[in-house]
Curated annotation (Swiss-Prot):
Catalytic activity: Hydrolysis of terminal non-reducing beta-D-galactose residues in beta-D-galactosides
Signal peptide from the UniProt entry: 1-20
Keywords, in A-Z order: Apoplast, Glycosidase, Hydrolase, Secreted, Signal
Cysteine pairs bridged by disulfides in the record: none
Protein name listed in UniProt: Beta-galactosidase 9
Group of enzyme by EC: hydrolase
């Protein structure tokens, strides 16, 4: 090949890359030289299985989405420092390639802080114990670890050819996450940290725009974006940046002990149309499919295993109707108006006391209008462009040609199809009692009480605190029968108390306050008495400041009252610690480890007990769940897969009526008051065999096995 031919080919290649570059101006992102209105939806790859991904992505595409948005979960990818994991549910490359195959784009939110109601906000716990570390500030050890991970992800995406300029689907990347509200409390290092993070991200040469959400001072060229229930009042920090909404909350998360929030689709559609009519050009539904907090990935603490989020695609991968259908129709209407929308900024006309018209025109004559009625109860008839239009309360009509109203946010024409849970069989149980008063060779003794996470490193939810109390023969309670009172103060999240192997009760915190106090009378005898406290975590916090200072477990004081001496403080005496449960170490929840212990008949409502049963997969292809509403608190496995924590914690809240009209918040439309926050637990079909499936429950409090049922979900 001649030198001239080579030069020509290089020029063609360079031109192709330049043409494919993702850029932006004040109006929108530009892809392949064209301004775009982009509709996006969050699907987090670890919250579903690889077998579910193609169907979820296709349903998103069918729903009118252009982009799939996902966080990158650091603690899933680097659970041990320097040891990386990118397989199974954490196969990020596979997920991104599936999005490409579907013809959609990707917004990759690398963070690496994610929040997301995810354990420890996505940070690996080992990071807390890096010497000298201070999280999310101008701190050398933290910045070094963060940069290593961000650069690794960018390098991996480049090597796989996954950025848009390489022919891949990634058009955006995000660094940090919702840091703006934290700056004022993070002190002088906050602003320099933000500037460093932005500069570090841009220096990776990812070749796509970087964003920071809820970051009003994001430095150029990083785009600051909005998160919230509504973002139509949001303005970027530069006239050269487009208005982007990275989290349009489609619902809200559920916490154990909390209600199930639901967001009416009429209001969600209204919020999106409000944003578009005010000049917004990128909107992402958080979540479009929420999925499941499998394993122990739920954060909070006290975040439920279900991350359904009232999303258009439900936790099980089924369409939530009419939400999915009504939003799909909205997206079609917006796309019909796209040419006019991207041409420039709207002009605004007052067409009533509460009504306005936002009109977009292109130089070629295209015209689109959004007619809005902000009254929360009264419909309106308005005049626009020589015609009259009826606008329901709290609604927007979309006119892609400035004449024909093809869509109204409050007029739902999509068919409703409520989901049903169908019984598919019961279980025959066997039980194995966890040893509550024995320690093995891994136990260790220290003076005083020690913080839980510093010992478990989150390898287990559980830590035994054990100490001994000597009771003299002269103690008055031995004669009176008025037993002493044990009081335990804990930073969270749940404790169970045993004395001499006998169970005396439990105490636990809640989402609004993880700290707890146990206080109860305990039976003791003359001589040495063994006090065993099982402390359990219910997810690590996912939002806040100074992660390096957070703690859980029994921090004290622990006191014993009602003795001749009055109150005895046990906090500073010797305590013996045992990380995890015996059954965990033996792997009784796994298919191979289940045979390592001797199982007996089904036990009654006993605390800290393992239960197992075998079952056949239900016929057909409908999603599968376990009904654990009759159980107490614990963890559940199927064929060795931890489907998550379960807890029949009764929901408290206000489950009154719900109108779509008026400003929405997560407290407005609630369900499940008085019932368990979560009753059904998703069991992915890909985890099942046709027959001989093993289900194992670790029950902490003592539940009713007779109520546990296999279910299928249909619409």
């Amino acid at each position: 090949m001649s030198g001239g031919a080579v030069a020509f080919l290089l020029l063609v290649a360079a031109a192709a890359v330049a043409n494919a570059a993702v850029t932006y101006d004040h109006r929108s992102l530009t892809i392949n030289g064209q301004r775009r209105i982009l509709i996006s939806g969050s699907i987090h790859y670890p919250r579903s299985t690889p077998e579910m991904w193609p169907d979820l992505i296709q349903k998103a595409k069918d729903g009118g989405l252009d982009v799939i948005q996902t966080y990158v979960f650091w603690n899933g990818h680097e659970p041990v420092q320097g040891q990386y994991y990118f397989s199974d549910r954490y196969d990020l490359v596979r997920f991104v390639k599936l999005v490409k195959q579907a013809g959609l784009y990707v917004n990759l939110r690398i963070g690496p802080y994610v929040c997301a109601e995810w354990n420890y906000g996505g940070f690996p716990v080992w990071l807390k114990y890096v010497p000298g570390i201070s999280f999310r500030t101008d701190n050398g050890p933290f910045k070094a670890a963060m940069q290593t991970f961000v650069e690794k992800i960018v390098s991996m995406m480049k090597s796989e050819g996954l950025f848009e300029w390489q022919g891949g689907p990634i058009i955006l990347a995000q660094v940090e996450n919702e840091y703006g509200p934290m700056e004022s409390v993070m002190g002088s290092g906050a602003k320099s940290y933000v500037d460093w993070a932005a500069k570090m991200a841009v220096a990776t040469n990812a070749g796509v725009p970087w964003i920071m959400c809820k970051q009003d001072d994001a430095p150029d060229p990083v785009i600051n974006t909005c998160n919230g229930f509504y973002c139509d009042d949001f303005t970027p920090n530069s006239k050269n940046k487009p208005s982007m909404w990275t989290e349009a909350w489609s619902g809200w998360f559920t916490a154990f002990g909390g209600t199930v929030p639901q967001r009416p689709v009429e209001d969600l559609a209204f919020a999106v149309a409000r944003f578009i009519q005010k000049g917004g050009s990128f909107i992402n539904y958080y979540m479009y499919h929420g999925g499941t907090n499998f394993d122990r990935t739920a954060g909070g603490p006290f975040i439920a295993t279900s991350y359904d989020y009232d999303a258009p695609i439900d936790e099980y991968g089924l369409l939530r109707q009419p939400k999915w259908g009504h939003l799909t129709n909205l997206h079609k209407a917006i796309k019909q108006a796209e040419t006019a929308l991207v041409a420039g900024d709207p002009t605004v006309q007052n067409i009533g006391n509460y009504e306005k018209a936002y009109v977009f025109r292109s130089s070629s004559g295209d015209c689109a209008a959004f007619l809005s009625n902000f009254h929360t109860s009264a419909a309106a008839r308005v005049a626009f462009n020589g015609r009259r239009y009826d606008l329901p309360a709290w609604s927007i009509s979309v006119l892609p040609d400035c004449r024909t109203a093809v869509y109204n946010t409050a007029t739902v024409t999509a068919a409703s199809s409520p989901a049903k849970m169908n019984p598919a069989g019961g279980f025959t149980w066997q039980s194995y009692g966890e040893a509550t008063n024995s320690l093995d060779e891994t136990a260790f003794t220290k003076d005083g009480l020690v913080e839980q996470l510093s010992m478990t490193w989150d390898k287990s939810d559980y830590l035994w605190y054990t100490t001994y109390v000597n009771i003299d023969s002269g103690e008055q309670f031995l004669k009176s029968g008025q037993w002493p009172q044990l009081t335990v103060y804990s930073a969270g999240h749940s404790v169970q108390v045993f004395v001499n192997g006998q169970y005396f009760g439990n105490a636990y915190g809640g989402y609004d306050g993880p700290k707890l106090t146990y206080s109860g009378y305990v039976k003791m005898w003359q001589g040495s008495n063994k006090i065993s406290i099982l402390s359990s975590a219910v997810g690590l916090p996912n939002v806040g400041t100074h992660y390096e200072t957070w703690n859980i477990g029994v921090l004290g004081p622990v006191t014993l009252s009602g003795l001749n001496e009055g109150k005895r403080d046990l906090s500073k005496q010797k305590w013996t610690y045992q990380i995890g449960l015996k059954g965990e170490k033996l792997g009784v929840h796994s298919v191979s480890g289940s045979s390592s212990v001797e199982w007996g008949g089904a036990a009654g409502k006993q605390p800290v007990t393992w239960h197992r049963a075998y079952f056949n997969a239900p016929a057909g292809g409908a999603p599968v769940a376990l009904d654990l509403g009759s159980m107490g608190k614990g963890q559940a496995w199927v064929n060795g897969h931890l489907i998550g924590r379960y807890w029949s914690y009764k929901a408290s809240g206000n489950c009154g009526g719900c109108s779509y009209a008026g400003t929405y918040s997560e407290k407005k439309c609630q369900a499940n008051c008085g019932d368990a926050s979560q009753r059904w637990y998703h069991v992915p079909r890909s985890w099942l065999n046709p027959s001989g499936n093993l289900v194992v429950l670790l029950e902490e409090f003592g539940g009713d096995l007779s109520g546990v049922t296999l279910m299928t979900r249909t619409t």
